[in-house]
Amino acid sequence: ADGSYVPIFQVPPVYPRRALERGIEGCVMLKFTVTKVGSTKEPEVEWAVPPGIFDRAAMRSALKYKYKPQIRDGEAIEVPNVRTIIVFKIDDPGKPADYTPEGCA
């Protein structure tokens, strides 16, 4: 049966130490390709808040993602331009559960 690509395994990013120490939160919108075997390749930053702080950590994390590949006519196919947003937020019991850093919603 044909089917869309489905995320199986998403590795949480490593929070950059300097950003954590300074209390900086943010997010990165990534674009990448899901391969025929369900791995990811060629991650690119589409935008980031704040720019340049979390880009490398987000790309490293996305390269470890695993997907069930997309199936068309019984064959696995590569899917370019898959987008995902990776949010970096500091755990704080005082924040609501659905809290998102400014500029990331």
Predicted regions and their residues:
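A short, conserved beta-strand element enriched in hydrophobic/aromatic residues
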Residues: 31, 41-50
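Short proline/glycine- and basic residue-enriched helix-capping loop/turn segments at helix->loop/beta transitions
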Residues: 1-33, 57-104
